[in-house]
Amino acid sequence: MEIQYLQAVLSDIDDLIRMRLAYIHDDFGPQTPDTEKAIESQLKDYFRIHLGKDCFVFAAKENETIVGTAFLVIVEKPANPHFLHGKIGEVLNVYTVPEKRRQGIAGKLMKMMIEYGQKLDLDFIELKATEAGYPLYKKLGFEDSPCGYKEMKYAYT
């Protein structure tokens, strides 16, 4: 069957949640039922509010089922010399179901995303690459981001 490439819409929310949970399972391992339920609940609300506004999901569909995704979250913040427009894109959830991997799906989705980000006048798109994804991102033109800052976070839990 032929794969269609498109931007996800609100009617795709259940598939987007399924793909996000599959990505989380692959990246973080199995979650407790309570954690999975909490994530699913947050995702439903998140997609209803943000999809098509500041979150754009590029999807590969086969037989009306999403088999690959790439999320682009737009972050707007005060400009500086590195992002004069104050708008950047963050890539999340580049994921293809196991049986469809190595068919160029992620690459096509990322190319769609890169083109769309340019139309949005983003200063750049950034991501955190897994070892498996790193060669693809390099091939697409992403560069290692040397930064003089140490990445840190403050966790509330």
Regions found by a protein language model. Name each.
Residues 1-14:
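Conserved N-terminal entry element of GNAT/NAT acetyltransferase domains
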Residues 24-46:
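Conserved GNAT-fold acetyl-CoA-binding loop/helix
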Residues 45-59:
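A short helix-loop-beta-strand connector motif used in the catalytic cores of GNAT acetyltransferases and
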Residues 59, 65-74, 90, 95:
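Conserved beta-strand in the GNAT
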Residues 74-80, 84, 126-128, 132, ...:
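Conserved catalytic-core motifs of GNAT/GCN5-like acyltransferases
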Residues 100-112:
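Conserved acetyl-CoA pyrophosphate-binding loop and the N-cap/start of the following alpha-helix
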Residues 110, 117-129:
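Conserved GNAT acetyl-CoA-binding A-motif
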